[in-house]
Amino acid sequence: MKTLNRRDFPGAQYPERIIQFGEGNFLRAFVDWQIDLLNEHTDLNSGVVVVRPIETSFPPSLSTQDGLYTTIIRGLNEKGEAVSDARLIRSVNREISVYSEYDEFLKLAHNPEMRFVFSNTTEAGISYHAGDKFDDAPAVSYPAKLTRLLFERFSHFNGALDKGWIIIPCELIDYNGDALRELVLRYAQEWALPEAFIQWLDQANSFCSTLVDRIVTGYPRDEVAKLEEELGYHDGFLDTAEHFYLFVIQGPKSLATELRLDKYPLNVLIVDDIKPYKERKVAILNGAHTALVPVAFQAGLDTVGEAMNDAEICAFVEKAIYEEIIPVLDLPRDELESFASAVTGRFRNPYIKHQLLSIALNGMTKFRTRILPQLLAGQKANGTLPARLTFALAALIAFYRGERNGETYPVQDDAHWLERYQQLWSQHRDRVIGTQELVAIVLAEKYHWEQDLTQVPGLVEQVANDLDAILEKGMREAVRPLC
């Protein structure tokens, strides 16, 4: 069986116009996949040079396959049908290592055609590293490497204003573009680079903050033999992802034309502020996950897919989204409903086995950030507590007993909560405290909730009633009236 390379698999090759920091699965099934579609359907005509930003030889370089690899996109499409689509990606030309090919790295700045910089160096990547110097070959942090590359560009083209870059980080931190820009400016000042360079950074370059959304499941280790048999070639960089994707970029309106999105519309939004889209994702996608997990798991289910195929649990989650979460969010209702519909479709994806226990990690913090804001907003708007979000809190407290049908399961959270719950549930079993007292102790933890939730009218009583119902009747019976 042949391995992918451009000699045996000839096809389009594009001029290098994009630098990408990061060789991982996510960027390859997200950014490079989108660039490949735009190259095929428009005159974007842009090839990617992947820069490996860390010192590692694993996985091997994409250049071993001349930049070629296959994405397999699978899940439920807009009509709810299971689809699996294999695509040979030709947008990546080569990969270079900033550690072993530093001069080649700097030379990227000399190419007049270079226009875009994408990155995903993990959440820890956009951070300051004390001691990074201009002359390091290379510096340790990604922002320092980028500063050096930008200065190379500035110097080579004598500060030409038409030679700046559009920089689009994909790291999962709030306002990632602003954070990256601040660090680049910090290094420029720390390294005493000329004032003209700092002005050029501001005038000629755009740092765009983003929200990225796609579950990328990466190399399909268990299915490789079968998939390669179907493809007819060997691919060491096979990359799998779900059907859904969303790319929200906070940047100039002209970006849509530069990326040729006007000629081939992808699910890419160019917006003035990513905040409402971030809130939408956290509240609907992450919030639904967090509400679902303790309810579904204690109802005897193990994966998100099983939960969505269970009529009662599915109804509970959908009613929580449409009746309690969406009404308090600040975007047009039709946009929110369309996003919610995509989310429930993603939860049903038959190709992804998402274990409920793995999503349950750090459930207390997730409830505070993902559900509590909507619970409180609903109470404020209507004068009554949203029934399902409140029930989800009771289910979460019950989940920390660590026992289902007489069998224990691992609960993962910070040590404080694990010890606290162990103590509280032990006292509850020994009848030292009642259910309402247990709930009041949990909700009074100001340092965690950032407020005293026992002051929210009716909350302690409602959560205690729900918790008693779960303990006395079991999850199935307790949740049924809300389905």
UniProtKB/Swiss-Prot annotation:
The keyword NAD applies. One of its GO terms (cellular component) is cytosol. SUPFAM superfamilies: 6-phosphogluconate dehydrogenase C-terminal domain-like, NAD(P)-binding Rossmann-fold domains. NAD(+) binds at residues 18-29. GO terms for biological process: D-galacturonate catabolic process; mannitol catabolic process. Its EC number is 1.1.1.58. GO terms for molecular function: mannitol-1-phosphate 5-dehydrogenase activity; tagaturonate reductase activity. It is an enzyme of class 1 (oxidoreductase). The keyword Ion transport does not apply. Keywords: NAD, Oxidoreductase. Pathway: Carbohydrate metabolism; pentose and glucuronate interconversion. It catalyses: D-altronate + NAD(+) = keto-D-tagaturonate + NADH + H(+). NCBIfam families: PRK03643.1. Belongs to the mannitol dehydrogenase family. UxaB subfamily. This is Altronate oxidoreductase.
